[in-house]
Amino acid sequence: MPLYRNQHIDWYRHLAFACVGGFFGAYAILCRGGVMGNAQTMNLLEMIIDALYGRGFNVLAHLGAFAVYVTGTMLTVLLPSLWGVNMRRLSPVITAAAAVTECFLPADMTVIVALYPIFFAMSIQWSSFQGARSFYSSTIFSTNNTKQASLALAEYLCTKDGRQLRRMGFFLSTLLCFHIGAAIGVGASHFWGVRGALWSLPLIAWAFFMVTQEEKAEAMQAVVAE
């Protein structure tokens, strides 16, 4: 049966992008000084610390990373609204471009600046794909997915509601795929160093394919609804 006929195609697309997010999380940590380029928490904390210690250049680098992340997030609204851009298709293309760019940035480059492509790509991925199966779930970090899986288990223990088991399964599967991607990122970084970013390209290609299958499914549903 073609994938686009599978009623869980949005879930499969979600898991594919979770693998991509996990890959870049591990890659950034191993190749770029232990900093995760998927989120802003550490970046902003380091910016405050550097400001208090008077490290002007570092503060500017962190501000740049913040601006890149905010810009990527805003573009997921601006591009579709102003020009009708399909962000679900554009996002993996941008991520692939970021992966290639990372290969040309020296390993000893200023860490935060070297992460700009990942900050940009992951901010776009996060806002372009916000979950599946009616669940809100990030594909670029694990905190909320861990929280939701834990809450679902607690709810099930209290109510014996089978829906909570399905909810827990969704978030646990997201965590699993995220860390499968991270494991691939570890291997890529170990064997290829900064050029290991290229290992993400098959994952990104598969995620893009899942987007096309989901779009076919949505088109079929629209025809049936008519």
Regions found by a protein language model. Give the residues of each.
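Alpha-helical transmembrane segments of multi-pass membrane proteins
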Residues: 1-226
